[in-house]
């Protein structure tokens, strides 16, 4: 019998192997149907074992020369070697037939095949072509699960053993893995040896180039059941692969690209994953153990298996390192809490939601104790690092978003440290967001920040009234946030009841207007006027408005109504007709001022005023026209003879024969960037300008119920006439156009109230070209 891989032949195998098999044959020839279950390094006497009977296991001492023949680097590996020989029986049930020479040779081959195939590093042979052993003999090595040699591959006429050397390069290892994975993909059962890639070298291998594309697809093919222990993966790319039931113990995984890599039901103990996990497209660890593994601080560990840690010391890494325990994992920490370290390790609000805080917190609740222990170690690190308030300030929000929540608040150590941090965070929020809108609350803000603010207002109830702008926003978002829990809403409602009972607030809610009209809020509808903001200047002044109105005024659109609220003084409703919204917001309710101004600058009506009434020639009149756009009603009237004469002098040159002069028309097109626009677009803009001048001429602004400035009526009608010439299609009908024209001039007995004309034209524009109207009409008139 020859080993088919070159110069090695059977005669080179030490005689001890032959003698061992001969001994087995001799001790079974007398009818013993024995189960020889193992041959291992033991001091048990062979003869003593045989005296126990035919059904008992028999243990043999493995000769030292056989161990020396293999010369593994780890002698303990061979000492643990097992040879299992099952159910060796005679073929005729007489119990007297000896094992044949051929069967003995097969047993010898099995012995050599299993042991040669499983040698470490320098002795990694692959044996192929062996015929099945007699009676289902199976051999196992290195304490690995026994794989039956009884499955029947194609039997060659003569027994041959093929020993192949270990792959000598990463490319060779990659080729071997590709072969095994493709066989597995094809449905071929792989032996333990087939899946054994321990001590492999995959450095610099990009796995997407050696495996079919389906392995990189979501829910694609899986690399299952492989042993990669002690293997090198440095600088390799295993992105988008799924490893299931694989073993990576003691492997080198530093500087590995593993974007979206999935490790499930795997053993990744004693591994370093430093510099391998980035904030984007992280790997996942599902039901995977990471005992004593070094993990970067931004890893996603939400599905790992944690166990109690052993007593091993913190690891040492090149370049230095600091670690804390998270269960039995080693979690990376900075050596020093520098400014960069504070931002990188703690500021998940600026780092795509990743920080050491979130890494710990995202573990499931069954690991509450492990999470609290890790956070306590983190806080101890803060204290020993002597973090100053100035250094903590940029990450206060991130810190309270985690540490001010259960279960960490149940730790006296953590609570004592986070309390002053939360107080400083709350003070900053009051200072910043009482006069400006809070950021649009996403899921994180609703679940992590709003509860902290509620808790802070609960601890400092005076801030509810001194900073009612912020307080009302917090309650608003708690009651409307889709990701807020019922518990958050209940606490918000309870706090608002305390607010309404405050002496500065309660006088404003018993006027038959608030909430459900009896002084209590009605949280069942967003239309109820449940919110009451106190003036920042006058304790007797308040604004009452609904949920929907408050939301839209904090985050306005071009169509937002800026007068859909009650203005209360001493609890009584007062008219806002002659109050400028911008002045009201600037003086009393600054939380709306920035949003109002942002919308106001997008309204371009003032550009036409500057064309007609230049500040150099008509400075006072220009100011009157601009000021009138900031309120719904004006006390200034321009119907006296002097005012009428002055307006006629200004507008007559612009309206020869009652129509826009060509030069003035071109000035309008240029001012509104309409020179190259379509006739319809030009017509829509002129129509909206006409509605604004109709408003100027009405009793609301410069006219009265019985009179109005003729120049303004004529100019409004001329703008409308030009719009009709350009695009009659934008009008409701020719009849409606004629009706509006007659009303401007009082022709054919038409009612001449320009307030009615302005309102009618404005409704039409809002319905058919609202964006044009919103870009022109002053906010106070909208």
Curated annotation (Swiss-Prot):
Belongs to the SopA E3 ligase family. InterPro entries: SopA-like_cat (IPR025725), SopA-like_catalytic_sf (IPR038270), SopA-like_central (IPR025726). Keywords: Secreted, Transferase, Ubl conjugation, Ubl conjugation pathway, Virulence. It is found in: Secreted; Host cell. GO terms for biological process: protein ubiquitination. It comes from the Bacteria. Residues 133-171 are annotated as: Disordered. This is E3 ubiquitin-protein ligase SopA. The gene is sopA. The active site is at residue 753. It comes from Salmonella schwarzengrund (strain CVM19633).
């Amino acid at each position: 019998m020859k080993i088919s891989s070159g110069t090695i032949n059977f005669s080179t195998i030490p005689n001890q192997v032959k003698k061992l098999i001969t001994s087995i044959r001799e001790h079974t020839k007398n009818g013993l149907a024995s189960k020889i279950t193992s041959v291992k390094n033991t001091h048990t006497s062979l003869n003593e074992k045989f005296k126990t009977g035919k059904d008992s296991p028999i243990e043999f001492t493995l000769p030292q020369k056989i161990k020396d023949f293999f010369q593994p680097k780890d002698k303990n590996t061979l000492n643990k070697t097992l040879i299992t020989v099952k159910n060796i029986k005679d073929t005729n049930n007489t119990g007297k037939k000896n094992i044949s020479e051929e069967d003995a040779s097969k047993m010898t081959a099995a012995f050599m095949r299993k042991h040669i195939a499983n040698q470490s590093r320098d002795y990694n042979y692959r044996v192929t072509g062996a015929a099945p052993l007699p009676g289902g003999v199976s051999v196992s090595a290195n304490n690995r699960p026994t794989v039956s040699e009884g499955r029947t591959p194609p039997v060659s006429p003569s027994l041959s053993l093929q020993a192949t050397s270990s792959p000598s390069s990463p490319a060779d290892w990659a080729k071997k893995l590709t072969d095994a994975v493709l066989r597995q993909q094809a449905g071929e059962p792989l032996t333990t040896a087939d899946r054994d890639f321990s001590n492999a070298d995959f450095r610099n291998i990009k796995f997407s180039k050696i495996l079919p594309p389906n392995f990189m697809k979501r829910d694609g093919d899986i690399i299952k059941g492989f042993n990669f222990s002690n293997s090198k993966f440095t600088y390799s790319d295993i992105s988008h692969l799924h490893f299931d039931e694989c073993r990576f113990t003691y492997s080198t995984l530093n500087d590995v690209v593993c974007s979206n890599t999935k490790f499930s039901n795997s053993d990744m103990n004693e591994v370093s994953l430093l510099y391998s996990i980035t904030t984007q497209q992280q790997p996942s660890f599902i039901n995977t153990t990471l005992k004593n593994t070094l993990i970067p601080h931004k890893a996603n560990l939400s599905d790992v298996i944690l166990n109690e840690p052993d007593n091993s010391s913190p690891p040492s890494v090149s370049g230095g390192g600091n670690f804390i325990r998270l269960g039995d994992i080693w979690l990376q920490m900075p050596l020093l809490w520098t400014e960069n370290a504070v931002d990188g390790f703690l500021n998940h609000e600026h780092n795509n939601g990743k920080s050491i805080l979130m890494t710990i917190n995202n573990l499931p609740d069954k690991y509450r104790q492990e999470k609290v222990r890790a956070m306590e170690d983190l806080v101890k690190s803060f204290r020993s690092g002597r973090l100053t308030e100035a250094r903590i300030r940029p990450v206060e929000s991130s810190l309270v978003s985690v540490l001010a929540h259960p279960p960490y608040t149940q730790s006296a150590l953590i609570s004592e440290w986070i309390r002053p941090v939360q107080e400083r965070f709350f003070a900053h929020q009051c200072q910043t967001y009482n006069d400006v809108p809070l950021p649009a609350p996403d899921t994180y803000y609703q679940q992590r920040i709003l509860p902290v603010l509620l808790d802070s207002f609960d601890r400092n109830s005076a801030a509810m009234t001194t900073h009612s702008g912020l307080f009302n926003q917090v309650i608003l978002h708690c009651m409307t946030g889709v990701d807020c829990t019922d518990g958050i809403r209940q606490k918000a409602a309870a706090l608002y009841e305390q607010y309404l009972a405050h002496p500065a607030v309660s006088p404003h809610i018993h006027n038959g207007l608030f909430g459900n009209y009896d002084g209590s809020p009605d949280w069942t509808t967003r239309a109820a006027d449940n919110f009451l903001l106190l003036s920042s200047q006058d304790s007797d002044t308040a604004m009452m408005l609904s949920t929907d109105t408050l939301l839209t005024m904090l985050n306005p659109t071009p169509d937002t109504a800026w007068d859909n609220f009650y203005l209360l003084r001493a609890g009584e409703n007062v008219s806002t007709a002659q109050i400028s919204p911008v002045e009201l917001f600037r003086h009393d309710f600054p939380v709306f001022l920035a949003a109002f101004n942002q919308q106001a600058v997008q309204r371009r009506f003032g550009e036409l005023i500057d064309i007609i009434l230049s500040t150099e020639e008509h400075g006072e009149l220009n100011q009157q026209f601009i000021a009138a756009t900031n309120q719904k009603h004006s006390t200034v009237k321009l119907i006296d003879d002097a005012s009428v004469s002055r307006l006629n002098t200004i507008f007559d040159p612009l309206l020869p024969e009652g129509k826009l002069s060509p030069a003035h028309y071109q000035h309008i097109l240029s001012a509104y960037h309409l020179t190259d626009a379509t006739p319809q677009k030009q017509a829509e803009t002129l129509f909206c300008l006409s509605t604004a001048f109709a408003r100027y001429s009405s009793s609301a602004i410069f006219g009265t119920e019985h009179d109005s400035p003729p120049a303004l009526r004529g100019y409004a009608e001329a703008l409308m006439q030009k719009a009709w010439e350009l695009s009659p299609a934008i009008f409701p009908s020719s009849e409606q156009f004629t009706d509006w024209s007659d009303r401007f001039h009082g022709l054919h007995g038409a009612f001449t109230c320009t307030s009615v004309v302005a309102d009618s034209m404005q409704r039409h524009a809002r319905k058919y070209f609202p964006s044009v109207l919103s870009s022109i009409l002053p906010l106070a008139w909208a």
